[in-house]
């Protein structure tokens, strides 16, 4: 049985880890980095770049370089959060036929799971290169506050990448696993404050040890799936744009190239200000107008940055208060605070968290790697390699159905431990009603329309009866991934209807299968592209070598002998510019065949060989000697 890898599919960066013996290990990617930027680029040559290579070319290809796709996954195009991103992202966000938020690339619409699958494929390949064997199974993490549609979309991304997703686990829970696995005995209640690139979560987790078995029980969770480092970056970018407009009278928001340069510079400045008090944002030739080129040079202090983002940090503390109240705990009952996510490196975040909890956060957890490590531990648990660890997670949002008057009736309260199952009996609203529509909702509001609609289905064939008489039993079943299954049964006729919630949007199985086939086709195309590049390199090498020999010994050949060689060189050069690998290989062989006389001319002549042999005798000790240490006996 192969290894089950752990993947932290992040908004800004992703990370992969695996159990190496009895210890989790973060795996370096092909570039030698322990984290990979969650950036995907589609080039003019139809090549797909992922990670650092995609990030490097973003400035010259802003419309086809996609980042922060996790903020769109499982969302509707009309969602308020998506509409905010539409106006600031350099790439195109479009409405899919089913109303989901998709991305437009080179005139084609692409689903977020399809794009995220490219990052997962990179993580899969990174693990395979390290392990030296195929990887087909993974535990993938999601923000604790992800709803059902977002969890389903993440699982879809795994399928498209060729991975069987053995478990979806919440990021703060994974971080708690990473933190608590090697800690000493005793019970602890910890708060995991997870502020990543695009999402924020706060989970209260109790770690108990009984008879050598560690139990990680999530008491409550809360968060904001549209609050993270990207929002901090956007505050910096908007400040720089506004300052530049004041100074130069030019609005850079209409220039995608300039905005991409500003995004990189803004992120860099934000990171620098975690250790420095001041930084210079210097972007020469950022744009030009009738008066000539314009340069951006703006000083940014830590104090200014903090004033720009202070409300975002304060906003993160609201879910903290709710999670504590839901767990029935006070701040003083929290033993340790764990910071996860790159944005928690900001001093202001650390100060606010310390002030709120009245204790300094732990520094012994790597905020970029803890989540992937925890996912790898859970993979080890599922594979049977890690014993004595029990994980009890919760559903982040209440679940229910719409009942008469447009009210949401809750069946499963938020923060219920999963897996779980709950049934409740409902009835008809009208006399002789023969069918009921079960409208499944997720959220905390009383009015049905104010909650997230997860889908609906009909139960038909109800026997005619006065209103309130038929008994319709509705059952909610949430599995360990947090995925919801709903059934409705008429107790009078025993007729039953079941569905696994596929959000009223989301990808169909056919669409996912097509994307899997596309991904496999792309893998074949990538292999062919690699072979073509190798053939071109061989051709270039041969052309260069032949030209060099022609310049050195070409005068020893007749014009009749040289002409076919020069023609074969020209033919090979022309073929190497094309896309036909077989044609290049044919021309390579043709050049090798006509170059025989040139090779002979390049061989040392007998007299030269004799001279070389003579000189070789006198230098035999130099050529053949082995180095050995000579000790000086004085």
Swiss-Prot record:
Q: Which CDD domains match?
A: ASKHA_NBD_HSP70_DnaK-like
GO MF: ATP binding; ATP-dependent protein folding chaperone; unfolded protein binding
What is known about its induction? By stress conditions e.g. heat shock.
Residues with the Phosphothreonine modification: 199
Establish whether keyword Disulfide bond is in the entry: no
Whether ATP-binding counts among this entry's keywords is: yes
Q: Where is the composition biased (Low complexity)?
A: 600-614
Q: Where is this region: Disordered?
A: 599-634
Q: Which UniProt keywords apply?
A: ATP-binding, Chaperone, Nucleotide-binding, Phosphoprotein, Stress response
Q: Which SUPFAM superfamilies match?
A: Actin-like ATPase domain, Heat shock protein 70kD (HSP70), C-terminal subdomain, Heat shock protein 70kD (HSP70), peptide-binding domain
Family, as annotated? Belongs to the heat shock protein 70 family.
Among PANTHER family, the record links this protein to: HEAT SHOCK PROTEIN 70KDA (PTHR19375)
Entry function: Acts as a chaperone.
UniProt protein name: Chaperone protein DnaK
Name the gene behind this protein: dnaK
